[in-house]
From Swiss-Prot:
The gene is kdpC. This is Potassium-transporting ATPase KdpC subunit. Its main location: membrane. NCBIfam families: kdpC, PRK00315.1. It comes from Escherichia coli O127:H6 (strain E2348/69 / EPEC). The system is composed of three essential subunits: KdpA, KdpB and KdpC.
Amino acid sequence: MRGLRPALSTFLFLLLITGGVYPLLTTALGQWWFPWQANGSLIREGDTVRGSALIGQNFTGNGYFHGRPSATAEMPYNPQASGGSNLAVSNPELDKQIAARVAELRAANPDASTNVPVELVTASASGLDNNITPQAAAWQIPRVAKARNLSVEQLTQLIAKYSQQPLVKYIGQPVVNIVELNLALDKLDE
């Protein structure tokens, strides 16, 4: 019985620290130092939440830039079904999916160059990716320009404006946030 008291007091102490103090402290510091990120990086227009800068959305119209394919269950970009979505490179089903996506993209983008960017035909590991390269966005310019009656130059400038450089120059590549880019396109129409 004497050994039970130190074990129980250690358990209660660690429960208090790991179950109360640590979560409250990290939440408070996150809200203090990074309030936008700690609250989901939500993109707001007035009182309306239009999306998150961290999670892609299913933009399908010709007047929008399309992101990476999402293979999440039930619906594209379903955050509750996030998980590995790509098949193994050796799987013949992956070849069929990529061929179908390439054919679909070429049909939707007849004025684009013939080389479809790889990130437009392969799903991300989470199925929720919101970023593509500026080159993949530029590949879609003819379709978006035609659908929105905008010039190639206007869209090129918009892509450049919403391109984000990696934190370290030689690690990573520039990306464009598709959600922010498409919301900016909608603002051009207003």
